[in-house]
Amino acid sequence: MADLEEQLSDEEKVRIAAKFIIHAPPGEFNEVFNDVRLLLNNDNLLREGAAHAFAQYNLDQFTPVKIEGYEDQVLITEHGDLGNGKFLDPKNRICFKFDHLRKEATDPRPYEAENTVESWRTSVETALRAYVKEHYPNGVCTVYGKKIDGQQTIIACIESHQFQAKNFWNGRWRSEWKFTISPSSTQVVGILKIQVHYYEDGNVQLVSHKDIQDSLTVSNEAQTAKEFIKIVEAAENEYQTAISENYQTMSDTTFKALRRQLPVTRTKIDWNKILSYKIGKEMQNA
């Protein structure tokens, strides 16, 4: 092991450490970071070389953050990334600095985003917040409005998590929805993601995703937002139901087949008793 460690360059060590960090299960970033820190045994190398991994993890996980002085949390996503460690909170029209390692937001300042799509963004955000409040008690959503390739685009992100370290499991739901504002109708594209880690007496992870496409009728802002939420609700309910049904099927069939079956006698074998019989028989023969 020591020889292998000597053969690895600092660059290779950082690359391996970054992979561990990026793939840390939800709610377990600190544990993975601390383990990697011990293995690498070079804090400066880790902080400088793996800084991109800290950022990538937060962007991928839709990490929610609370900004001092503001009521609602905002998600850290690629859509709100303004560069140089700054992110956008479109609801409060502010930008802020975000520390990817400490997961802290600081220095909030006013920020004016795309005004041409703001009324559409606000309508979708209002409808989505009501939906999230009903379906995800601990959920957070952030809605962006921006021009992409010259088209007015709405991007809606949802995150909800349950971290139960005392019960040896953590899980996170993420969904991202996108559509352009065009006359008559448009295409809604979404991706739904579930990641759960269970680690009591074992190590089991569920990592699942589903891509969604649907048509959306575009009329006025309020009605379009309402129709958009119907698509979101139907797709997310269907996906979550399918996941639950698959787990039940696996429990009834696949996992059951893995369990050790009882012998023909339908009773468990008492190996201690069999051993004592064998010893007794050998003593008699002696």
Curated annotation (Swiss-Prot):
Protein origin, superkingdom: Eukaryota
GO cellular component, one term: cortical cytoskeleton
Biological processes per GO annotation: actin cytoskeleton organization; barbed-end actin filament capping
Residues bearing PTM N-acetylalanine: A2
Phosphoserine: residues bearing it: S9
Keywords: Acetylation, Actin capping, Actin-binding, Phosphoprotein
GO molecular function per UniProt: actin filament binding
InterPro entries per the UniProt record, alphabetical: CapZ_alpha (IPR002189), CapZ_alpha/beta (IPR037282), CapZ_alpha/beta_2 (IPR042276), CapZ_alpha_1 (IPR042489), F-actin_cap_asu_CS (IPR017865)
Pfam family, one: F-actin_cap_A
Quaternary assembly: Component of the F-actin capping complex, composed of a heterodimer of an alpha and a beta subunit. Component of the WASH complex, composed of F-actin-capping protein subunit alpha (CAPZA1, CAPZA2 or CAPZA3), F-actin-capping protein subunit beta (CAPZB), WASHC1, WASHC2, WASHC3, WASHC4 and WASHC5. Interacts with RCSD1/CAPZIP.
Stated family: Belongs to the F-actin-capping protein alpha subunit family.
Protein's job: F-actin-capping proteins bind in a Ca(2+)-independent manner to the fast growing ends of actin filaments (barbed end) thereby blocking the exchange of subunits at these ends. Unlike other capping proteins (such as gelsolin and severin), these proteins do not sever actin filaments.
Protein name (database record): F-actin-capping protein subunit alpha-2
